[in-house]
C-alpha cells in the first residue's frame, strides 16, 4: 500500500493494497486509537473490512462488482465483507436473487452514503423493490439490503388527456447523451393514470427524467429538494 501514518489518534480511513497481479486491489479499513489499561502508552491499530454487506432480506442474494468478477453469495441475515475490487473501480455493485436466472439489478454505488431503491425480479413478483442503505461507522462502510415495505420512491400521475412517455437519462442535451441514453427504458403513462417508479440507473450522478408528449420533449433535473415543476 501507500505509506501510512500512525501518528493521528482517532484516524479512520480506507487502505488500498494492490494485488501481486496488479489488476485488483484489497480494500481495508484502518482505525487508530490510544491503548487502554496496560497498553495506555501504545497506539492500537485495527484493520477491519472496508465494505461489509448485510443481507436483511428473507432470501439469499448474489452481489458482484458491475465491472465484472465472480459474484459473492450472501445468505439471509448474513454479513459478508467485500475485499477485492478492480483497479480504478467506481465501486458500483449489482445484485441478483439466488435462483432467479441471474437477472441482475441496475448498478448502485456502495460508496455513496444514503438510501437507494432497486428493482429485483422474483418468480412470484415481476417488480420487487428493495432498499439499499449505505452508512459509515468508523473505518467500515456498511451496506444493508432491506425489504422495502413502504411506498415506492416516486408516483408519476398523468392527469392530462394525453399519453406521456418518460425515461431516465444522464444528460439534458442530445450532444451529451451516452450510448445507453440513446436506447433507454421507456415507460408509457396513459391519460388519467398513475405509475410507481424507481430510478433505472440509481448510480448516475445526475438524474434527468425526459418527458415526451405530443411531439414535444423536456428534461427535468431531479434534486433531493425538488425538480423543476414546469414541464413544458
Predicted regions, residues:
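Tryptophan-paired
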Residues: 1, 66-99, 174-217
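Asparagine-centered strand-capping/turn motif at beta-strand->loop junctions
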Residues: 54-57, 157-160
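A short, solvent-exposed loop/turn motif at the edges and junctions
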Residues: 1-8, 97-107, 111, 123, ...
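Short, ordered, surface-exposed loop/turn motifs in non-cytosolic proteins
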Residues: 59-68, 162-179, 232
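Hydrophobic beta-strand residues in large extracellular and virion-surface proteins
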Residues: 63, 93-97, 132, 156, ...
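Eukaryotic basic, amphipathic alpha-helical target segments in cytosolic regions
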Residues: 34-36, 55, 61, 65, ...
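Compositionally biased low-complexity segments at domain edges in trafficked proteins
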Residues: 21-48, 126-155
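Conserved small/polar residues in nucleotide/adenosyl-binding loops
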Residues: 222-227
Amino acid at each position: 500500500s501507500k505509506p501510512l501514518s500512525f501518528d493521528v489518534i482517532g484516524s479512520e480511513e480506507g487502505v488500498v493494497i494492490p494485488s501481486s497481479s496488479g489488476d485488483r486491489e484489497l480494500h481495508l479499513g484502518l482505525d487508530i486509537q490510544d491503548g487502554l489499561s496496560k497498553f495506555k502508552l501504545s497506539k492500537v491499530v485495527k484493520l477491519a473490512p472496508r465494505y461489509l454487506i448485510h443481507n436483511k432480506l428473507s432470501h439469499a442474494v448474489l452481489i458482484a462488482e458491475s465491472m465484472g468478477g465472480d459474484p459473492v453469495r450472501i445468505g439471509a441475515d448474513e454479513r459478508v465483507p467485500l475485499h477485492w475490487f478492480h483497479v480504478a473501480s467506481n465501486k458500483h455493485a449489482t445484485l441478483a436473487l439466488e435462483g432467479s436466472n441471474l437477472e441482475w439489478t441496475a448498478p448502485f454505488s456502495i460508496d455513496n452514503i444514503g438510501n437507494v431503491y432497486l428493482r429485483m425480479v422474483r418468480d412470484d413478483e415481476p417488480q420487487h423493490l428493495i432498499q439499499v442503505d449505505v452508512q459509515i461507522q468508523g473505518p467500515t462502510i456498511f451496506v444493508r439490503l432491506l425489504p422495502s415495505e413502504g411506498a415506492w420512491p416516486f408516483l408519476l400521475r398523468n392527469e392530462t388527456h394525453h399519453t406521456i412517455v418518460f425515461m431516465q437519462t444522464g444528460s439534458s442535451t442530445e450532444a451529451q447523451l451516452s450510448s445507453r441514453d440513446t436506447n433507454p427504458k421507456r415507460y408509457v403513462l396513459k391519460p388519467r393514470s398513475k405509475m410507481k417508479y424507481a430510478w433505472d440507473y440509481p448510480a448516475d450522478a445526475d438524474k434527468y427524467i425526459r418527458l415526451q408528449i405530443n411531439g414535444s420533449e423536456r428534461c427535468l433535473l431531479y434534486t433531493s429538494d425538488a425538480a423543476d415543476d414546469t414541464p413544458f
